Structure formats: C-alpha cells, structure tokens
Amino acid sequence: MKAPHSATYQDNYADAAMTARTRPSMDMDQQRNRNQAELRLLPAQRTSTSAFESPDLRFNKARRRRRSEQVPPVVVEYRRSYRVLIVSALLVSLAASFVTLSAGFQLDGSQNSFYTFRKWYTGLNGTLELEFKTEQPNGLVLYTDDGGTYDFFELKLVEGALRLRYNLGGGAQIITVGRELHDGHWHKVQVLRNDEQTSLIVDGVSQQRSTKGKEFQFGKFASNSDVYVGGMPNWYSSKLALLALPSVIFEPRFRGAIRNLVYADQPGGSTRRQEIKQQRDIKCGDVPCDHGELPARERPLRGVRGGNTTDACERNDPCQHGGICISTDSGPICECRNLEYDGQYCEKEKAPSEATFRGTQFLSYDLGQTGAEPIVSAQDAISFYFRTRQPNGLLFYTGHGTDYLNLALRDGGVSLTMGLANGKQEMHIKPSKVRFDDHQWHKVTVHRRIQEISSITSFCRLVTVVDDVYTDHSHIAGKFTMLSSSRVYVGGAVNPRALLGARVHTNFVGCLRKVEFSADTLNLNLIDLAKSGSKLIQVAGNLEYQCPSGDPQDPVTFTTRESHLVLPPWETGKQSSISFKFRTKEPNGIIVLATGSKQPRAKNPVLIAIELLNGHIYIHLDLGSGASKVRASRRRVDDGDWHDLILRRNGRDAKVSVDGVWNDFRTPGDGTILELDGHMYLGGVGPAYNSVSWPAAIWTATLRQGFVGCLRDLVLSGKAIDIAAFARVQDSASVKPSCHVQANVCNGNPCLNGGTCLEGWNRPICDCSATLYGGPTCGRELATLAFNGSQHMTIWLGNGQGTKTQTEELVIRFKTSRPAGLLLLTSAESNSPDRLEIALVAGRVRASVRLSDREKNLLAGQSVLNDNNWHTIRFSRRASNLRLQVDGAPPVRGMLSETILGRHSTMEIRSVHLGGLFHAEEEIQMTSTMPNFVGQMQGLVFNGQRYLDIVKSLGPELSALPSATFKLTARFVNSPAGQPYHAATFRSKHSYVGLAMLKAYNSISIDFRFKTVEPNGLLVFNGGRRNDFVAVELVNGHIHYTFDLGDGPVTMRDKSRIHMNDNRWHQVSIRRPGPKTHTLTVDDSFEIISLTGNNMHLELAGILYIGGVFKDMYSKLPASISSRSGFEGCLASLDLGDASPSLTSDAVVPSSLVVSGCEGPTKCSQNACANRGNCVQQWNAYACECDMTSYTGPTCYDESIAYEFGNNKGMVQYTFPENAQADTEEDNIALGFITTRPDAVLLRVESATTQDYMELEIVEGNIFMVYNIGSVDLPLGEIGTKVNDNAYHVVRFQRKGGNATLQLDDYNVQALTPQSHHSTVFNTMSNVQVGGKFSRNGRNRIERPFAGVIAGLSVNKLRILDLAVERDPHITIRGDVQLVTGVLDRNDLQRMQQTPASGYPGALDDLIFSGAGSGCRGDDEDECTPPFESGSGDDLITPVYVPPTKQTTTSQQGNSLSTGGSSSGGVITNGTERACDDEDCVHGSGDYGETTEQFTSTSTARGSESNNEMVTITTTGRSDVTTEQHQGSSSSSSSGSTPSYATTQSSSSSSSGGSAASTPGQVSTTSSVATSSTQRATSSSTSTSSSTTSTTTTTTTTQATPPPEIRSTVTERETTPYDIYIAGGGMGGSGRNDHDRMQLPDEHHPLPPLPPPIPPQDPPPYGPYGGNTYNTNMNNYRPKGKGGRINSIEEERTAMIIGIVAGILIAVVLVILLVLWLKSNGDRGYKTESEKAAAYGSHNPNAALLGNTSTNGSYHQQRQHHMHGGGGGGGAGQQQHHAQQQMHNGHNGNGNGGGGGGGGMMSSGSGSLGYGSDGRPQMAGLVQPKAKKRDSKDVKEWYV
C-alpha cells in the first residue's frame, strides 16, 4: 500500500525540484533570516557558504578559485552582480526586521513544516491561547491527543473559519467560529475548559459545546502526546495507531505565523508562554524519534522560516516576576496573571490580599444554592498565611455532599480532617516546643491528588505543610475518582460546630493573607475576589481588607542569658517616661540599659537601667551629677505572671510604679537632662566582647545575667515600640516574637550525672557545680587543669584595663593532697590594695576580701579537704555581704564593717591568678603568704565567665580576646570520656531530623559525638538570610566546618591523622570565643582561624537540620558544601549553646529512621550484613538472612539472579505445586529493579480458589503494592520518590494480617493499618507472575508489561528467579526475557549486557559488537521505524562471544573494479579517482553496519548535528542500484557491481563508505558511518522472500553544515520505501565538506529510466560540501575553514604519487605484521573487523577483541593517521587491491558454513558470518537460536 504513496511523493518531490529550478533566485533577506542549520528543498537556497563569512570574504575566495578554474560565462555574470545582491539583501533585511517584529513562529506549509511544544495539561478547567495570521483558508493549526486512545483536540482552518474538533471520551464534538480569518491579520484564539463545557473564542466571539460521559479528563498526562502546531511529524504516517484521530495526518499544513502560545504544561502549574520543545524534553520511548522532534537549534527547520528569532518576546522578554509576554504588532506587552505584581512589566508589587477576622466575619460560597455544578478536579490545593494569638479557630473548609476537608487551628497546632467516600483521615501538626498562635505569619499548604490504582480503586494522597518545614502526609483508598467542591468557608462559618469533621467550634480571630484555592488549573484568590465584589463570594460581617503591619502588644521572649535586642537611642531630654509589661520565673536579669556620653561638667555618664535582682525590680538613674538606685517593687515579681512597670521623670524628680504601686524618688546633684546617645539594650548586654560599659552598681550586668522571660507593650515617652519587629530582624533564634508558658520543665530529670534541676523560664537550669560535668544538662566532661607548684594561669580582664565591681560570684572545684595552697587571687593596680583571695589553709577553705583598708576573712569546711577528692567552693559578694560555701555544707556569711553602698563597696580587679601569684614578665614568685597550689582545678566560673572552657577552646596559642587575655603554664588533663547521652541512630543516608533554629547570632557553641563507618555525610546544616549559613559535614572521613557570616564561606578542617569513620566515638567542639575568632576541636586536633571581615552576626533562618536535609535540598546547598547525602551512624551528646536537645523527643521534624540509642558494634552489628540484611546471632558467629534485600551471599553483598524484560513483553511465571498452595497470614516480598517505565506491573500473586491477590506495580512513576485478601483493594505506596529513573531500587513489602508495610530503598517505611475489619488470610496461593500480569479474558495477553531488570526476587523466602535459572519445572518463561549479569555496574542511563567469558583456550576476553535499538514500544518490530537517536559517544556495549572457525581462503570471482567503489575525499572525474590533499580531506568512518532487522518507513530528508548513527537494511533478491545526487544544477548517476572488499581510507582522506562485495550469485553493498552529523534521505529498497541471496546496504554522509538532498533508488520487482540515516560524509564516506558519490560502471547493469532533463541554471557559488558532480573543472575547490592548498596540477600529482607510495609501504608492513600475528595465534579465532583490527592492532594488544562496532568521533581521531585507502576509496585504492585480497579470508558464503568476514587491507575476517539455508545471516560455529524479534533495548553500544 505504501509503494504508490512513495511514488507519488517522489513525483511531487521531482516537481518541486523542477519548479525550484525555473524560479528566479530567492530574495536575499529571506535567505539571511533562516536558521544556520536549515536545510531546504530548493537548491537555490544552498547558494550561501557560511553565515560566519562576510560577503567580501566569499567573493575573494571565488576570485582565488578562478586561477585554476574555467568558469562559465554565466558564473562570471552571476558573480558580477553578487555584491549588488549582498547590499540589497542588507537593506531588505533591515526593513524586514521591523516588519517581522512580532512575526512569531513562521511556517511555510511544506511537507516538514510543524513545531513541537510541551504537553498541554488540560485538567478539567484548563485554557489554551494562541494568535495566528495566514492568507491560506485551510490548514492544521494545532493538534494533541491522549496517545492514541480516544481523547484529542484538533484546531484547524476550514475555508477561512476556525474549527475545533475534540473528544473527551463521550464522542467527538465540533465548534466552528469566525469567517474569512485568512485575511493576513492577527487573530486571537482561546480554548477554555470547564468540566463538560468546552468553549472556543476567536477575537471575542465565543461558542461552546457540552460533552456527555462519566468523566471528562483528557487522557493521562504521562501518556498524552505533545502539542503539534502547523502540522504533524512524518513518522506518524507509519504509526497511525498512535493517533486518536488518524485523519489528522492528512490535513493540509498551516502556512502563516503563530505566536503567543500560552497554556499550562505541568499538573498544578500555572499558564505560561510556551517555547519550542528543547532536547532535554524529548523522550523517544513512546514513539520513534525523528528529526521532527529534535530541538530547533540541532536540526534543520525545514518548512519553518526563521524560527522565532524575530519575536520581540523571544529576543528580549521585558516581563518580570513570571509575567507572560505577549507579542503584538506594536511591540510586547506583559500579562501579570496570578502574580503578586502588576504594572507595565509586572514590576510593581501588589498590595497583599489580606483581611482581618474578628470572630464574626468570614467568606464563603455555595454553588449548590445557585444551581451550579461543583468544582471537580483530580487534584486541588489550598494555601494561605495566617497570624493569630488565639489557639483555636476555623481556618478553611471545603466540601460537597459527604466529602469534606476541614482545616483549623487547635491548641496552637494546625489540625486537618478529611472525608472522602467512606474513608476518613485526620492529622494534627504541632511540633515539639513550637506553637502557631504566636501572632507571627505562618504559611499553610494542603495538597490532595487522586491516582487511579485500578478500575475500582483510587488512591488520594494528602500532604499538609506548615512554614515549608513541618510536614504530615497520609492517604485514603476507596471508590472515588474526583475531588469535588461546592461549598467553601474561610475564617469561620455561621455554625462551625455543624461542619463535617469539625474539631474546633469557634471562628478564627486574626489575619489571613493570600487565601488561594486551586483545582487543577483553576486558581481562586478568595480574598481578592471578595475585595473586588465578585458574585461568587459572599462576605459575612464587616471585613477589613488589611492587617496591621506591627502591633506594640506583640510580646517577645528572651530565651537565654545572652539574648538581647538593640534599639535605636531613646530621645529623652528633661521629661521622659518608659512603660512595659514583663513576666518571668527567674530572679535575676538586666531588662533595660541605656547610656549616654559624659558631659564636660558632669560627674558621671548619664544612664538609665532597670534590672530584676533577687526577684525585685531596681531602677538605676544618673543624670550626670550622681547615681540613684531604687527598689521599685514591694513584693517579688518572679512568679511567672504579667507585671506592669511605669517610670516617669521630670528633671530630677521621678516616680516608678510596679503593678499600680507608686514610689517617688529624686536624683542627686543638679543634673536635670537625660541625654542618651547610645543604643538601648533590652534583655541583656550581649556577649562578653561587646563594648558596652555600665556602672558597677548594676549587679546583673556585672554578673552577665540577662533577662529570661517575656516583654511586651514597650512605650518610650508615649511612643509605642514594636519590639517583635526588632526580634524578627535581629537574633530571631534567641529572641522569640511570642510568649508561651511551659510548665514543669524539670519533669523527667533532664540534668545528668547528679546535676540539680531548677525551674527557669521555659527551660531547665542544671546546677552542675557539684559534679565532674558541665554543659546545659551536666553531660559534658569539664576541662581540668593540673598544677605542680610552679605552674599557674593568669587572666587579664578588659585586656589589662581591668574592671570595677560591686559584686562577685565564684565557683571553683579542686582536688589536692596538700593542706595549703593558693587557689585564686585577684589583683588591682599597684597602688590599690583591693583583692579577693581563695586559699586552702590547714585543710580548710579561707576567703579573704579586702576593700581599701577594710578586710574580712571567712573560713569554711568542717573536715579536712586535702583528701585528694573533688570539692566545690561557692563564693559570692553583694557589696558588703559575703557568702562562702564548700560542698553541700551550710554557707558561712559575713559582712565588711563600716561600708556604705557606693564607692567604698567597689573593688578594682585587673587580673585573676589561679594556682599561684607570678610576675607577669619575669615569672618569678612574688611575695605571698600562701604556697602555690599543687593539684587539679576545674569548673571555674567567675562573674558568669567559664574561663577554663574559654582557654581550652583557644588552643595552645591562647589568642587574645577583646574581653580578656590569658597566660597559662599549667596543663590540661584529659578526663576520661563519659558515656554518650541522648544518643540516636540514623539508619539511613536519607534520614534527618529538624531542631529549632541554632542560636548563633553573636556566638557559636556546638558539641557532639559521633560514630560511623561511612566516610561522607552531612551532619549539621542551618541556612540563613542572604548567604549566611553554618554546616558541619563528614568528608572522606574528616570533619569539615563551613560557615558564612556574609563575607564569603570559610571552611575549617580537622588535621587528624586518622579517619573518623572507624566505628569509634569522636568528639567535635565548635566555638566562637571572639567576634572574629572561630575554633574547631575534633578529639585532640585543634584548629583556629581569625577572620578580617566586617560582619559580626550570623543571621540564620529556618530550622537546624541534623543528619542531613531532604533530598531536593542538596542541590540547593551552598557550593562550598560537598555533601550530597546524609549521615548514617550514631550521634550523641549534642549540646547547642545553653540547650541539650534530644534528637528524637525534641525534634520539630522527626524521622522514623532516627531512633533512640546507638545500635552499637556488637557481634551482630548494624553493619554486619550489607544492604539491610537481617543479622542472626549464633553461638560464636552470625549469619545474614538476605531474603528481603534483593542481594545474596554470606553478607548480602553479592548480586542476585537478574532477568531483563524487553520491550516486546515477557513474563516469568511460577506455579505452586498443588500440594504447596498454602494459606498465608504473613507475606514477605522483596526485589530489586531498574526501569524507565512510568506504568507497569512488576509482580502479581494470585489465589487458586478466591479473588485474593497481591500486585506490585508502578503508577505514574511511583511504586505501589495493592493487595486484597477477601474484602477490598488496599493500596500502599511510596509517593515521594519516582522509580522510573533507570536507577536500581529495592522494594520490601511485609504483610501481617490486614496490616502491611512497604519500604523503598532507605526511605521511610510506609505503613497501612485498615480501620475496618478485614480478612487476614491469603487463601491458596497458586502462582506468581513476574514482569506483568495476564489479562482477565485470557492467559495469552500480558497487560501492563514491565520493561527493565528485576533481580533478587523473594516471595516468602522463595527465590523465583533462581528457580528459573535452575530450569525448575514449575517455572514458565514467556516472551522477551533473558538472563543478565552485572546489573549494578550499569550506566545510569543505558544498559550493558554481558555473557560469561570464553572458555576457549587463548581467549583473553569477550568479543563485543555494537548496534542500535529502535526505541519502539510496539509489539511488532516491523511497525517500528529505525532508530534515529543521536549517540553521545559514550554508549554501552553488548559483549558476545564468537567461537573460532577454521580460516579459509576463497578466491574472488567476477569483476572487481575499484572504479566502482565509492570515492573518498577526492572528486570523481570521468569515472576515475584521484587523491585529495590532506588539507581538503577529513576523516570519515569505515565501520561496518551490523545487519539487525528489516524495516519499512517513509520520511523526508531532515538532518541535524549529531553523533554517530548507523542503519543497516537487509533485503533479499538481486538488486540494481542507481544513485543520483543533485547539487545546484549538477548531478551524477552510476550503476553497477562493486568489489568484494571493504575500503579503508588513507590518512589524507576519510575512510571509505561505499565498498561492496559481488559474486555471480550475490550483491552486497556495505558502508560505514562517521561521526559528524546525520541526514535523512528518502529512498527505496526491495525485498523478496524467495531468493537465497542477501544484500546489505548502508549509506553514510559526513557533514559540517546541512547536506543537499540525495535521491537514491534501488530497482527491484517491488518497491518498498524505507528511511536511511546518512551519518558522516557523503555517500560512500567523505570529509566534513567533501560530498562524495558512489558510481557503478554502466557496462554491468542497465540503467533505469532517468527523470526528465533539468533545464540549465546559473551555477551557484560553491556550497558547503565542495565538489561539483558534473563540473570537471572544479577539482581544486578547497573546503571552507581550511588553510591554503596546492593549486598546480604538477604539485597535486606529486602529492598523489607520494601518497600512493606511502600507502603501499604501510600496507606491506601491516600485512607482514598481520601474517606474523596470525601465525603466532593460529589457535585463536576471532570475529574482527578490518578497520578495528588495524586501528587497535598498532596500539592495543587487545585489538582482536573488537568485533563489528560502529565508531565515535574519538575513535576516528585516533585512527586517521594510521590507515590508508583501499577498495578505490583513497588515492591508492587500486594499487592496494591485491594486498587486500591476500588478507581477505572469506566471502559471504551461501550455505550453513558460509564464510566471508569483512574485507579491506586490514581485515582478518574469520568467516564468522555466513548465511543459512534460509538465506538469513548466521554465525558460523554457533547453533542458531530460535528467531526472536529484536527490540531497541536488546542491543546497546559502548564505544571503547
């Protein structure tokens, strides 16, 4: 049926060519506007050489050619007008650029005129828009369908009217709109869907139709076709079954312009402007790939003029923030659809769509009341932002009938209930220590999606995400198909208690923003609709469409002693006031501190401070003339309740009120003005290195005690301050913009190792002073110093400037055997006697305090303390009050005599000495009454500073800090490591937990211990604002600490000599002791770095990830982080500043794969068995059970038996014996697989007596197990990961009764627990079907076949694939199934199959051959067009062993004429060949194509830049070959028989591609393929089944720019059209630009009738392929891009002679070497190929291991200087013919033992390929297997 069509096409083709030749030369402006890669039918369009060459350069080249050419007069005349044409073209092009400003996509209506765009996701309410312009009344505008079933959309012009024909399953509908639309003007078209309603709008005129049926989905998005504009790809002509409307292929193509194609191309995605489909979007698995689907920049756009290059939106899209650019005649405009921006270019941010709800207002719509149909969709989404202080309230409700979704705020968490069909689901997101009623904005997203599992069961996935961090997901399975919504309530309802699924009974109070409800592509912004007065939305109450930007009533919580806020200076003056509310349970803390500079006549700097001391409020006020300190509260206020404070002053007079009780006071001196020019500090004074000064009278500041509690309603001099806004932009981790109370924080005894827990404000305070441990929970070992009597430690405070204090607090622990010794001593300036001394005297502790001339001694300790045990000393001073306590004994108190508060109670401290008093410079002992200390000290805390920990973190160099300088001669003692605490095991690299944000704004303190055997993994990560982040990772067994404060990332690495992945505990400590000092300590390895940047704060945001991040986040991590997987192992003893969180109970984002405790290294450890094998402990060993791993071996590490299921359907079936059909209450199934199929059945288990079954399947790329044990279908799946990614996955399924679990790889375990009663027994398990399932109506057809690899299948410990290998009688293998090995070694993208190595002697390795698959999914390979994929150069191989055969020599019969071979590199003149210069010739390919299959198809030439391509066509019968080429006005034709040897090119030319073999009984034509570019030619081949001979033809072309059309005709009894990919050079091998021809002598075969003569035409300039077929005077043409060449005939002849001689010499040498090699290896037999043997023979000892293999570009580069011509291909082809015949060891025989391998000079064919009695090619020495259809994935390529 296709022969007449092909003939008609050929006639049309010839008519088009004839018409082209009689047309005048084409306009130059059209020529310039074409794509550089464009290939035209019209020869006149091939006149230009390269778009990169100027006209003058081309003209000068033409002048140089005249020196050696006889140019016809018509050519001279043509070139005289050439410059005129060029100038004219420039002017016309300039004018055309304005005319075609918005030309869009141009189509000329030719046979190959069409565009391909991404799939249209129609949903149930999708839209599609475009504009078109044409002058033709008929043409196909757009087409898309469901892949060939029922549904389609066809948009076409019919007699000037636009007709939409569509089918949604209920029958075709037709809508026609418009008339005379072919007027050359732009027309706008819209296709709108709304469930069953479909509308067509043209220029505002609308028509609509309704579709009848049960559902209105448009196919399935995964299998739907692309969108084709202007026409259909040609390959559909032979694949009509893939079209839902086959007649569309015969529609006339559109001729005109298309622009502004807008639609949604992803589920849930927004509409956007579409562009031509790019290469990464091309998928060739569903249908044969052809050039019509290749990207525009990599294929010649035949039939499309200029692409979209003149479209203003394409050249420069002015739209911002995702606006859709629309081209118009007046220029581009922007449509800001569904955006938060507007303006001309969508550049202005819209006012937020928000509203304030106060409990009586809400939004709603009810479609049922208006009689409208509900909104129906396959997926919907709800998203909004909310802010509230109320813990309960209805947020959103939607439903229809009994289906509902109720979203509310309950107890400060987000609560969701859903009912669908008969299933109900409920979730409550309330992370640990996190509440959402904190009056901060929170984002909520709810997404539902329905997936059809079977015809009666669907699966609804529900995902809820809060703040993009806190996630919960679940699913419901049942008999439903769609999601419906007819009612919606936002913010409340008339009676929220009556709504289905209600868990709260109150309306929402607070603010809502951007409330959006989307159903498929429908998107409703409900607040915007209400604000604009939409009739759809009903508004209850007086709704205010705005939210206050800030509220002074918003509270903040200071969570640590160091947390604080910095406010701008407070403008005070003579009168001022301050008021606020506070609450806390901690007795001490500085609340407000504001200072000013000292005035010239003032006594002191001005100051105001408010502190909480011993549970009371104290006011400090100094106007410069004297300080006053007043206690403002009469009772304690540290009771956890809110308290009000008001302070007012007028000059010196002031009064303060706490909870309404006023107290007046007056400042001393004559100062009346309070001028505060410094920052105001709230909650604390910051880290020790802050340059903040305060008087000694503010005791809490001296003791570094910040306020921990809540603060709100701050008003300064009548101005309300939104302190929550400051908290959000400053230290948001430590200062929370909310206030909540956590009671009983000491429950559960959080303090370890004997620490004492005290109730703080929402935090436990652990007193570790009586223990050997420190840290937030007394879990970390203390730093211990050892003194030997001559060692000491000295601390200079304030870098030697010293400090003045009225209070001191000291804690120190010691251990000694000496009765006396100096423990601690402070010193002041040399003229000051102030000091504090703590010493051991006679075995007791003495504290001596001296202020000026007053001194007081306290003695404590009832027993002797020099007992070499640890003792704790606590000392404190409050002005004149002293307190000393040793261990747990009652404290000793005392008071300094005759002191008053103020100057006389102030102590000057310049330095602190431990262990002894030494001179700073000379280190000689100064006069002291006490001996130096001998023993150990630890746990020193002096005025809130842990100096021993600071010194240890600074390392041995003791870098100076802004707050202190150190000198140390004592040594640190390595304390014995304690037991890890809060240990957790990360069982997978995909697991992680989330904690509250790391508190690292001013300082960093991170400690943890870890143990692992994995060398890499992310341990800690916290992102931040801008580029700030902090991360800790394990890289190659070493710790990397990376951070960025805004000055660029900095990475610190440990310098340990050992790798940390040794399954031992390792300690990591990270500190920031100074503003620019960072330290990393890993075990004993210490690193320190000092930065020079100006940024002082680490501004983090989000949560702190421990053990990894979610998988999609790795690609977004900063480039300085190398981890791409998480941590697997044990993590413990995590201390983060003042907190020690548990990785399980305190995680705000928990993980089921992170469990408490460390599954440590016992005999049966977690690492004993690989791949999650089950370790079984035995008496003195362990064993690994591998049934649930898909692996095997003693440790579950070895690969299991694997089978590959091809595209032609196949199945492995196991039938249980009748006596073994068991009833099972538990089932365990595991397997590994690799596939790219998005929909397939991997496994099905059936019952013999009931409908029970288990089916493991892939649905839309997700893995599901659906099982039924007597009641209903129960689906269980992993939705979060796609498995059709060609990667190896392991799935494990376990069932116990009705409950089941499924785990994919190392991801979270998915569990299913049916709520209703279900049967628990699977009855009479009868058979297992692997690779698909049988259809219900019979046992012959396989439904939903699997294509890929399945390995290690275990069903209840029964390894079915192992039984298949053992040929178990209960196993049946059907169809395209074969055993494979090396599954895990495969490339990620392609497959490699290999067979066991040869057992024959002398065989070093497997032989290999390569071919190409078709990529065809059809069952019948004859329906598939040949593969036309462009290779990457790194394809895979299929090793195949070829047994040795006896070497034979067959004499050649018949005529073998080198002149009949193809030319290579040279130009054929009058039937002779000559060598080309090496500057003109470029290498090609001389490889043989592997004969694989017969195929038929028809296509039109279309080429593109690509890599190696090979197509081999096998036909039977005697063939006469006629080859005709047309280039410009030139052509050539030849016919004849070709010699029986292959041809190999010399180094100065490309390899031959046109050699053939001929005997009286057969004709064989073989050529090779080169790597450069490909071209499609329309040709015909013949085949008959009665002949016993075979003809193999391969045509190749190498090109750098688009080649001309090639007409090749093979004449035979009947004509069968077929497609040929022409890769490489011209027919018969060529260089990049040499277009070679194959000529067959006339005297051997009669010529078929030639087409009519072609009228002469002005010859064009030399095309990009060089060489004119008929013009014999153009032999010296030099391809573009090359340097100068030889111009004289004598020089060329000399070069030819030199080349011939050199070729003969090299050939002789190679022949000798080859003969010697064959003699020395006579016992070996290989199937080799000529060029491979030579190319690798001189370089690679394994040359003979290469069989018939196509090559890639790198191979050609390697070989081109090592090969010489043969077979008439090169300059020395005839001279080498005899040598080639000597090497030729066989011919293609006609019988079972047949012989000839390849030919050519370097061939050593072993006769391995012959022909059987049936005429089919057969491997000699092998028993031929049963014929099996070959599919695209049976053979892969791997170029070596």
Swiss-Prot record:
Residues 24-37, 1632-1646, 1831-1840 have a biased composition (Basic and acidic residues). Gene3D superfamilies: 2.60.120.200, Laminin. It is found in: Synaptic cell membrane; Presynaptic cell membrane; Postsynaptic cell membrane. Residues 1718-1840 are cytoplasmic. One of its GO terms (cellular component) is type I terminal bouton. Residues 309-347, 742-779, 1160-1197 form the EGF-like domain. SMART domains: EGF, LamG. Residues 104-289, 352-547, 554-739, 784-964, 982-1158, 1201-1416 form the Laminin G-like domain. Residues 1491-1527, 1747-1757 have a biased composition (Polar residues). A motif (PDZ domain binding) lies at residues 1837-1840. Zn(2+) binds at residues 1831, 1834. The chain crosses the membrane at residues 1697-1717. Its main location: membrane. The keyword Transmembrane applies. GO terms for biological process: associative learning; chemical synaptic transmission; locomotion; neuromuscular synaptic transmission; positive regulation of synaptic vesicle endocytosis; regulation of locomotion; regulation of neuromuscular synaptic transmission; regulation of terminal button organization. Residues 1447-1472, 1528-1600, 1774-1787 have a biased composition (Low complexity). Disruption phenotype: Viable and fertile albeit with reduced lifespan. Reduced synapse number and impaired synaptic transmission. Neuromuscular junction (NMJ) synapses appear relatively normal, but pre- and postsynaptic densities are incompletely apposed. Reduced active zone formation in NMJs during embryogenesis. Reduced excitatory junction current amplitudes in embryonic NMJs due to fewer synapses. Shortened axon branches with fewer boutons in larval NMJs. Long intervening axon stretches devoid of synaptic boutons in NMJ branches. Increase in number of GluRIIA clusters. PROSITE patterns: EGF_3, LAM_G_DOMAIN. Residues 1788-1813 have a biased composition (Gly residues). Belongs to the neurexin family. Neuronal cell adhesion protein involved in synapse formation, development of synaptic active zones, synaptic regulation and visual function. Plays a role in cell adhesion between the pre- and the postsynaptic cell. Required for proper proliferation of synaptic boutons during larval development, a process necessary for coordinated matching of pre-and postsynaptic compartments. Promotes presynaptic active zone formation and neurotransmitter release. The intracellular region is required for chromophore generation and subsequent rhodopsin 1 maturation. This is Neurexin 1. The lineage of its organism: Eukaryota, Metazoa, Ecdysozoa, Arthropoda, Hexapoda.
